[in-house]
Amino acid sequence: MSETSWNEQFRNRTKKLAIAIIKAFSSWKKTDEIRIIGKQLIRSSTSVAANYRAVCRARSDRERYAKLCVVVEEADETQFWLEILVESDLIKIEEILNIRQEVEEIVKVMTTYKYRLEKNSTQ
């Protein structure tokens, strides 16, 4: 697979994640806690998608690395908010199992990509 098609595939994947989170949030009971945490979750997940797009359009390796750091940070924050929702018994894990798995995979892939980019820039 070429780098361009991989980037396109991952852009779509991060966007689908953000959309899945928005749809999940819209189906949850709107308590104050869910509203507050849900909005944070939407912000972090849409930031993953938006910043990955920026990674693909970076003008230099430095810029690509900086944006990739943001993607990893925001994806990790997305994981955090999902954990908070489940561990505080606001939603059941079954409601977001697929989303949690997808976020975990994105964190792993982006962290690996970040380390490879960092390693290549120091050689």
Model-derived regions: residue spans:
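Amphipathic alpha-helical assembly/interaction segments
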Residues: 1-123
